[in-house]
């Protein structure tokens, strides 16, 4: 029996690879000779760096960068040496989890550290980037990142504008004569699952500003300043289009990537499935196992397990999913390629107990074992 396991992390409990190894252990308790291949899985959000880097035999790098408020923070990203690929999450340098709730103010938060991470990876030889941009604390249009990469986002005195969204109103001109030379050799696959534009009622300020600490007055101001920035960008780079879907991602960071770098915005799960070459493994499998922390109606809206199931169905493979918990509306998963799903909780416990990594691992191994015992009965 050949089984391919690609399971997303159970957030707060098991990483993608830890969950996958637990599944493998459960299978081998029943089928000791089974060929089980564990592949990393993520959707471009939290956990992507660890899952892809470790799952593809890369290495994790630590670098000190400028945090959202200008204070130094330690950011971690991954490098795949063979393909000169860097795997990053912008939240490592400019994420909302780095900002205390009472401190949140997008007028002051910057993406400068994101640019520093990119520069560090370029200095280490990377030319291909996989970039997750969820969970941002910023609304600076990616200006901070661009400044760190050598772009001049200048005020009337020829000085770099201030950090944060407040700096957008200061922009007088944009220069690129000091951009790091290697940037033109780099390509970026940006994991982006939002379609919001840069400005307007569905723009980043209006939709995501409140969760970053913006007041109604701030939202109105930031939207005008971003429009000003977009106009100047368009004069410098005609390809810039503030109305393109995804330009409002991460407080306008999507706009900066599309306008100033060789970047494409793509579904996070699409990037991960392609970069890990999961399809090659699924082709040769007898059975595919996937899952995530919680299976519900949202799972069918482009979450990682459904991406795995779609590939499996392309080759007529059966799919089993395991998850920390399952809601009543998870039945929709059966209509989207998951043949059967199982929660791993084995008794009534507190949330803390359920999420304990030792308990989660034990529950996964034991649940998988029992499901595969049933498969063995059927095979006999």
Annotate the PLM regions.
Residues 1-133, 137-380:
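N-terminal loops that bind phosphate or other acidic moieties
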């Amino acid at each position: 029996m050949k089984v391919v396991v690609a399971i997303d992390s159970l957030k707060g409990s098991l990483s993608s690879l830890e969950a996958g190894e637990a599944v493998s252990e459960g299978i081998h308790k029943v089928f000791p000779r089974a060929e089980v291949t564990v592949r990393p899985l993520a959707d471009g959000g939290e956990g992507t760096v660890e899952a892809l880097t470790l799952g593809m035999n890369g290495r994790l790098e630590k670098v000190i960068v400028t945090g959202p408020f200008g204070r130094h923070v330690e950011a971690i990203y991954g490098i795949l040496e063979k393909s000169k690929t860097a795997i990053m999450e912008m939240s490592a340098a400019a994420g909302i989890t780095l900002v205390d709730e009472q401190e949140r103010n997008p007028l002051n938060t910057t993406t400068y550290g994101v640019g520093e991470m990119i520069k560090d990876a370029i200095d280490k030889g990377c030319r291909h980037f996989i970039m997750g941009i969820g969970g941002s604390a910023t609304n600076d249009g990616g200006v901070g990142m661009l400044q760190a990469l050598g772009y001049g986002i200048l005020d009337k005195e020829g000085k770099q504008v201030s950090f944060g969204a407040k700096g957008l109103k200061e922009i007088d001109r944009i220069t690129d004569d000091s951009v790091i030379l290697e940037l033109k050799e780099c390509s970026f696959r940006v994991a982006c699952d939002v379609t919001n534009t840069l400005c307007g009622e569905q723009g980043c300020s209006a939709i995501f500003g409140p969760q970053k600490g913006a007041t109604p007055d701030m939202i109105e101001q930031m939207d005008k300043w971003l429009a000003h920035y977009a106009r100047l960008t368009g004069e410098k780079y005609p390809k810039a289009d503030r109305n393109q879907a995804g330009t409002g991602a991460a407080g306008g960071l999507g706009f900066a990537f599309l306008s100033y770098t060789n970047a494409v915005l793509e579904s996070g799960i699409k990037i991960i499935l392609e970069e890990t070459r999961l399809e090659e493994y699924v082709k040769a499998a007898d059975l595919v196992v996937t899952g995530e922390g919680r299976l519900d109606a949202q799972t069918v809206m482009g979450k990682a397990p459904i991406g795995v199931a779609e590939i499996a169905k392309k080759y007529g493979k059966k799919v089993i999913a395991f998850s920390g918990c399952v809601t009543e509306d998870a039945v929709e998963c059966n209509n989207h390629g998951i043949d059967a799903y199982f929660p791993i909780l084995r008794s009534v416990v507190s949330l803390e107990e359920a999420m304990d990594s030792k308990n989660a691992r034990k529950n996964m191994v034991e649940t998988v074992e029992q499901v595969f015992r049933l498969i063995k009965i059927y095979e006999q």
